[in-house]
Swiss-Prot record:
This protein is involved in the repair of mismatches in DNA. It is possible that it carries out the mismatch recognition step. This protein has a weak ATPase activity. Keywords: ATP-binding, DNA damage, DNA repair, DNA-binding, Nucleotide-binding. The keyword ATP-binding applies. It comes from the Bacteria. It comes from Yersinia enterocolitica. The lineage of its organism: Bacteria, Pseudomonadati, Pseudomonadota, Gammaproteobacteria, Enterobacterales. GO terms for molecular function: ATP binding; DNA binding. The keyword Lipid metabolism does not apply. GO terms for biological process: DNA repair. This is DNA mismatch repair protein MutS. The gene is mutS. Belongs to the DNA mismatch repair MutS family.
Length: 38
């Protein structure tokens, strides 16, 4: 079941992300950070 699976670090990062508060540069940095996690 889903409850027994570990949550991906990328998913955890996305859950804490507030896209409306990011500058375009910060958003780009997040994309690269998330890409490196998967």
């Amino acid at each position: 079941t889903l409850l027994n699976e570990e949550v991906s670090p990328a998913v955890e990062a996305l859950e804490s992300l507030d896209p409306d508060s990011l500058s375009p540069r910060q958003a780009l940095e997040w994309i690269y950070r998330l890409k490196n996690m998967v």
